[in-house]
Structure formats: C-alpha cells, structure tokens
C-alpha cells in the first residue's frame, strides 16, 4: 500500500513537471526575445537553409521528413508530393507555419534545437528519431540555431 502511494506521488510530481515545462515554453514563445531587437523567424532563410536539413539523410538515422510527415509529434511537416525531392512553394509556406510550433524566436531552448541534439551536447534525451546532431558545431544544427535566432539571407 505504501509503495502504491509513493508511485502515485511520483506520477503526480512527474505530471506537474511536464505541465509546467509546457507552460513555460508557451510563455517564452509569447514573449519577445531578450535581445536588442526581438528575433523574428524568416521565411526565405527557412526555405533555403532549414528545409534542406529536414531532407538530409544522416548515417544511422532516417531523414526528418520520413517520420515528421506521418507522426503526430509537435513538429509535423507536409508530405512531399509523389516523385518530388523537395517541397513546392505552397508546401514550404505550410512547413514554415508548422515549424513555428517548435521554434520560438530567439529562444535557444526551442524544441527545434534541443530535441534532435545529442544529450551530451546539451540536447534532450527524448527524440524517437535518435540524436541527429552529435554536436552544437554541426553545420546543419547551426542552420537551425541561426533560424531560431532570426537570421536572414543576405
């Protein structure tokens, strides 16, 4: 009986932590970045630099597009048209809108950055597709970071 109460208490604490984490992300997303000018996500940068990251095959991993078009995860991507190797303009705009759910402008704790990053490099351990990036020095991870921080094409 005592073990059951303890297990219930742990479940309650875990649920509270989970809900608090979700609420803090929503709060962070609703607040502007703490830089001199609030970061804004740039569509042109997204299309040119971020979408290719979702299409890249990395050793030992599926491409992001493989799982994130059919799953019900917070990051959902539009499926590629049959026979296409990339998205068309309309699909890219839809992806841009969808990605904003996990890319809070100016927030380095954004799930887009933390989720696919190896835990040893500062990522979180809960990504079903494995740790796509082993280091914060990975050029593709740096493209995601630049996007979240508001980079634009020059």
Predicted features and spans:
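Intrinsically disordered, low-complexity repeat segments enriched in small/polar residues
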Residues: 7-8, 29
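Aromatic- and Gly/Pro-enriched helix-to-coil junctions and flexible linker segments
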Residues: 22-154
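N-terminal secretory signal peptides that target proteins for export/translocation
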Residues: 1-5
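Alpha-helical and His/Cys-centered functional microenvironments
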Residues: 7, 16, 131
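Sequence-pattern detector for short linear motifs
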Residues: 8-9, 148
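Bacterial N-terminal signal peptides
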Residues: 10-20
């Amino acid at each position: 009986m005592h073990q059951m109460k303890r297990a219930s208490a742990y479940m309650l604490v875990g649920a509270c932590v989970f809900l608090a984490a979700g609420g803090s992300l929503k709060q962070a997303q609703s607040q502007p970045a703490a830089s001199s000018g609030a970061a804004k996500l740039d569509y042109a940068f997204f299309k040119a630099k971020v979408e290719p990251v979702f299409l890249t095959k990395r050793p030992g991993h599926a491409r992001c597009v493989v799982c994130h078009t059919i799953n019900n995860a917070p990051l959902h991507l539009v499926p590629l048209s049959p026979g296409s190797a990339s998205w068309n303009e309309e699909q890219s705009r839809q992806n841009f809108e969808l990605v904003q759910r996990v890319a809070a402008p100016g927030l380095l704790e954004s799930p887009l950055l933390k989720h696919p990053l190896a835990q040893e490099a500062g990522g979180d351990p809960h990504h079903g597709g494995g740790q796509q990036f082993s280091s914060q020095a990975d050029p593709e991870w740096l493209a995601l970071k630049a996007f979240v921080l508001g980079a634009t094409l020059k």
